[in-house]
């Protein structure tokens, strides 16, 4: 391989790494809202899966503990699914043209 070709590949790899770091930061800082019970419970979660806020409708205070626990769990699960979908969509744009098989998960 020519010297210039190798330098070009190295530069391209460095640019890709910088874009990937920026994308990872963007994904980590993104917030999604998961909901359950037709919006009676909502959970705001970051791309790092940190729960920022849990909101319960006042009407739920009359429900028994198990119903409330189930609704909170469902809202958290909804938020996690949304984060994973968001991550896949963002990574798909980044990895398009790399020739990776569909559904391939990057190790980060």
Swiss-Prot record:
One of its GO terms (cellular component) is bacterial nucleoid. SUPFAM superfamilies: YbaB-like. GO terms for molecular function: DNA binding. It comes from the Bacteria. Keywords: Cytoplasm, DNA-binding. The keyword ATP-binding does not apply. It holds the Pfam family YbaB_DNA_bd. It is found in: Cytoplasm, Nucleoid. Homodimer. Binds to DNA and alters its conformation. May be involved in regulation of gene expression, nucleoid organization and DNA protection. NCBIfam families: DNA_YbaB_EbfC. Belongs to the YbaB/EbfC family. This is Nucleoid-associated protein Avin_19840. It comes from Azotobacter vinelandii (strain DJ / ATCC BAA-1303).
